[in-house]
Amino acid sequence: MNIKQKIDNLRQEIDNWNYRYYVIYQPIVSDFEFDKKLKELEKLEAQYPEYYDYYSPTQRIGNDINNNFAQINHIYPMLSLSNTYSWEGINDFYNRIKKILNENFVIACELKYDGVSISLIYESGLLLRAVTRGDGTTGDDVTTNIRTVKSIPLKLYGNNYPRFFEIRGEIVFPWAAFNKINKERIENSEPPFANPRNAAAGTLKTLNPQVVSQRNLDAYLYQLLGDNLSSDSHYENLQLAQGWGFKVSNIIKCCKTIDEIENFINYWGKWKKSLPFAVDGVVLKVDSIRQQSLLGRIAKSPRWAIAYKFQSETVKTTLHSVDFQVGRTGIITPIANLEPVLLSGTIVKRASLHNEDIINALDLHIGDQCYVEKGGEIIPKITGINKEARLTFGNKAVNFPKNCPACNTPLIRFQNETAYYCPNYTQCKPQIKGMITHFASRKAMNINVGEETIETFYRAGLVRDIADLYEIKIDDILQLKRWAEKSAINFVESVQQSKQVPYERVLYGLGIHFVGEVVAKRLAKAFPTIEQLSIANNEQLTTIDGIGNQIAQSVIQYFSNENNLQLIRRLKLYGLQLFTIQKIFIDNKLAGKTFIISGIFRKYSRDKYKELIENNGGKNVSSLSAKTDFILSGVNMGPVKLIKAQRFGIKIISEDEFLKMIE
């Protein structure tokens, strides 16, 4: 046997041991024997670098090189699931599927893992890329970190898998590993992770793959996607994937009746804490891929699936005090400080009280015994008070402040709103820092700066508003402690690059109350320049789809403030995009034609197809009518659109047909 064959045999043997240990829990060698073989392979690979293989089991460990996460577009959108906490919701889902399909169907019931969603792309049996959910359209490329998760195969078994496919699942932090790392963090005077989901998410975004490798994350796969799947059955596809080396839970049941579904949910609702990982419900999916395609999707979720969320656990503890926090928009949020208590596997010390109305409804007093639960097993909240246990003296009632806890400005409360606001946004420190953080965020200006750095700049007097970011010089930063020249240069370059961010994102970054991403896009389209928007009246604003009186008044109020107008003049002076760049038609091949885009696409994103339509003289519309010329259809086109298209005689075209039209 030559050296190459010996190395190949060792790799194959260790891959097999990894699979048996991490995926099917059937180890066949001791840890000592495994480590011995791994070291032998490492030694041979070091001696014969010409036989280096990126997919070798020795390459899972990672290295100390930091990497920035690239943004990757999903081939298929990573939709979120509709959810319910009631049997009524399950029955509604089941009956809706029954009515739409009007044929026999099977529901696959699976556990809902409480971790981080991941999309894995394989080509020719090799792991090509791993991407987080992100915003559902675009996610972070975390391939380097995912390679260290030992239950995810770098190279598949057998040869009966599709040449190119995607498989999705959940990265979880098993309870044993989670408890171990929290114990170590406490011993090292580090704050413990709040729960396994947060720990998994934080670990996956760590820039050091070696740290990820040491934390023993696990992965369960639950959906196969691709053009050439072996079976029409979701369940059968998962069983095939298990044979390729993927970890697929055996806790999955194909149900033909509503009673079977309820039995599955009841069983795991009772025994969920016996599992080695956190779960927060059960996912129901129509098993047939064909039927899934017929059912299609709504804006954010598939019609063919729903998540049943387990009811929250409730515990009793003591209220010690209440803090009132100031958010970036000036909203005052009361936070209860509690006697630490174990709730759903985590230590709870704080809970949101949301607003004054809730405090008054609870009749909250310091020292009260409170009933606390986690909404959806995530956010702690006080749901009640044990008034019988309240002392007859010494319990001080919790009263909402009349003045801002940060700047002492009298608070205001708008009509029909439950929140109180601090109106002093130009001088209130938490608002200033929050506004700058929002402005610099990825979805706005995408400036490479975090909350801690903004705090440092604020304390040094470098920033008091968003425009000040554009005045900071490298020399200013180098005067601060622990700042290297390279970091200072990177920050300043990031600020300069933000000047190319389009108008709609600048508008979103201004932080106008009630103006989120979608509203900012609509305003930018209706008013191509900031000057036009600044003089718009209520009537002009409310004629825009999706903009009501509340948003309109907020926009008008913002631009009626001289401080804001002065801020915008400064931003304009610094060269920010405060106008819409008019699109120039590349061609007029689609002139006079209207299109609706529906479904999931393989070659380009929906936004890219919309751009191609407009660049070739066509028009995108949002609703079907007899005047619509074409439906550009991908996978999972909605059944309602299909019915309407047939009624109106609208031509349905594929991606390839569309691309031929604009060649």
From Swiss-Prot:
It catalyses: NAD(+) + (deoxyribonucleotide)n-3'-hydroxyl + 5'-phospho-(deoxyribonucleotide)m = (deoxyribonucleotide)n+m + AMP + beta-nicotinamide D-nucleotide. The gene is ligA. It comes from the Bacteria. Residues 585-663 form the BRCT domain. The lineage of its organism: Bacteria, Pseudomonadati, Bacteroidota, Bacteroidia, Bacteroidales. Its cofactor is Mg(2+); Mn(2+). One of its GO terms (molecular function) is metal ion binding. This is DNA ligase. CDD domains: BRCT_DNA_ligase_like (cd17748), LIGANc (cd00114). The active site is at 112 (n6-amp-lysine intermediate). The keyword Zinc applies. Its EC number is 6.5.1.2. InterPro entries: BRCT_dom, BRCT_dom_sf, DisA/LigA_HHH, DNA_ligase, DNAligase_adenylation, DNAligase_N, NA-bd_OB-fold, NAD_DNA_ligase_OB. DNA ligase that catalyzes the formation of phosphodiester linkages between 5'-phosphoryl and 3'-hydroxyl groups in double-stranded DNA using NAD as a coenzyme and as the energy source for the reaction. It is essential for DNA replication and repair of damaged DNA. Zn(2+) binds at residues 404, 407, 422, 428. One of its GO terms (biological process) is DNA repair.
